[in-house]
Amino acid sequence: MKVIAINKKARFDYSLIDEFEAGIVLLGTEVKALKYHSASLNEAFVAFRRFELWLNNMHVPPYKPASRFNHVPTRSRKLLVHKRQLNKISGAVRTKGLTLVPLSIYVNENGLIKVKFALAKGKKKHDKRQDIKDRDWARKQARQDFS
């Protein structure tokens, strides 16, 4: 598994409930640009549209050798999931306060580009502060164990 892009802020801003994997519908120039490890998930989000999952605002920069036949960098891209998973996800998203957040894009062992996304609930500011305190405390304990 070769990771192309990671959404680092997702784990900090949201508490993740359940993770899913999906295929993604891409154009040829997008595939080539992604294979060069150039993508950004910082502003990306997953949304439902007509009983389908769509990945919005993922930035894939233009593939330089393609010149005028390039893609639109932030276009919406369809995610491919099984119908059973789609029903489970749609039921969960209807719950107040839950959203779908993309976590990473990677190439699996078969050479297919996949998106890992999660069902998540937004954290409040005090939750984020508590996470930072817990992380610092764990680091301090790990240092003391080595001493």
UniProtKB/Swiss-Prot annotation:
Keyword Transcription: no
Family label: Belongs to the SmpB family.
One GO process term, biological-process aspect: trans-translation
Listed HAMAP family: SmpB
Source domain of life: Bacteria
Keyword RNA-binding annotated: yes
Basic and acidic residues bias: start-end ranges: 128-147
Keyword annotations: Cytoplasm, RNA-binding
InterPro entries the record matches: SmpB, SsrA-bd_prot, SsrA-bd_prot_CS
Protein known as: SsrA-binding protein
CDD domains: SmpB
Taxonomic source organism: Neorickettsia sennetsu (strain ATCC VR-367 / Miyayama) (Ehrlichia sennetsu)
Protein's cellular compartments: Cytoplasm
Molecular functions (GO terms): RNA binding
Function, in words: Required for rescue of stalled ribosomes mediated by trans-translation. Binds to transfer-messenger RNA (tmRNA), required for stable association of tmRNA with ribosomes. tmRNA and SmpB together mimic tRNA shape, replacing the anticodon stem-loop with SmpB. tmRNA is encoded by the ssrA gene; the 2 termini fold to resemble tRNA(Ala) and it encodes a 'tag peptide', a short internal open reading frame. During trans-translation Ala-aminoacylated tmRNA acts like a tRNA, entering the A-site of stalled ribosomes, displacing the stalled mRNA.
Gene Ontology annotations for the cellular component aspect, listed alphabetically: cytosol
Primary localisation category: cytoplasm
Region (Disordered): 124-147
Pfam family, one: SmpB
